[in-house]
Every structure is written in structure tokens, then in C-alpha cells.
């Protein structure tokens, strides 16, 4: 019963969660090489450009895997029920992308700082997203999990398209005006 899935508010919370957050990951994935090239002059084909991207995604990979372990730690060590443990972990992960606001300023110290900070932000996002997927199993019977996952994946794809299309349009508009892009006191091309 595909259409019956839409009768549950849990389905809609998953759809909204994927729609608004998947684009963040694709933004990091798509724009990180251009960021290192435009801001620091390291093309993605250069040794340093490759090292920065590998560092960023190594941090994302290792820490996002830990993100799957944290809720279990809350359940096993703190005695929380699985859903509460997952929600607490997701709250913690939701704060990890915030330091990305300082990545541009930290780049004045070393180009490695933005790679590390953006890596931490990406790891927080991916850990949050992995736990969001796990909530489906907490809320729905086995027969509905694939359907809900597919619906959320589609919503995430549409949200990602809109976020990245909008980001590209803003960057192009700013460049056409000859203006620097400014955000919270930080300035870039």
C-alpha cells in the first residue's frame, strides 16, 4: 500500500528531513573542489588539491561511521531506549556543521583548517543522515521500510537539486555583479 504510507506523519517527517538536508551533503561534495581552487588556487588535479579533498572525505568517512555507534553507546551504556538514544545522537550531530561558518576565516591560518572543519561538518551531516535512515526501522514495519526509504530518497534528490541549483545561481549572480560573496563577515569570490 504505497499511498497508505502518506497517511502517517512519520513518513512526512522523514520526507521533510531528507528534502532539507540531503542538499547539504551534495553541496559539500560538489562545491568543495571549486572552493579549494577558487579560494586557495589548488586545482582538484594538483597534488595539494587531491590531498585536501582526501583529507576532507577521510574525516567524513571515519567520523560518520562513529555516528552509527553513538546511539548504541547511549542504549548500552546509559540504558536509554533505542529511539531516545538515536534522537540524542542526532541532536549532537546537528551541531557539528555549525563550525563550518568559520572555515573561510580559518583558511587565513592554513588551507588545512577549512578541509578539517568542512570534514567535521560533513561527518556530522552524514552521521545525522545515517541515523535518520535508521528511524524508519524504529517507526515502520519491515514491509514498509523500502517504500519509505525510496520516498525519502526522492525527496532528498529534489531538495538537493534545488539547493545546488540555487547555490550556483547565487554564485553566478554575485560574480556577474563583480561583488564578493560575503557571509557573516567572511568574504570570498
Show which residues each predicted segment covers:
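Helix-boundary and loop/linker segments of multi-pass membrane transporters
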Residues: 2-8, 45, 82, 106-108, ...
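Extracytoplasmic gate region of multi-pass secondary transporters
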Residues: 7-68, 121-133, 137, 160-164
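Hydrophobic residues within alpha-helical transmembrane segments
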Residues: 16, 20, 55-58, 92-96, ...
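Interfacial helix-cap and linker-helix signal at transmembrane-aqueous boundaries
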Residues: 36-37, 70-71, 75, 166-175
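Loop-to-transmembrane helix entry
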Residues: 41-59, 84-88, 112-116, 147-151, ...
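A membrane-interface helix-boundary motif in multi-pass transporters
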Residues: 82-88, 168-188
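C-terminal transmembrane helical hairpin of 12-TM major facilitator-type secondary transporters
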Residues: 83-132
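A late C-terminal transmembrane helix in Major Facilitator Superfamily
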Residues: 137-174
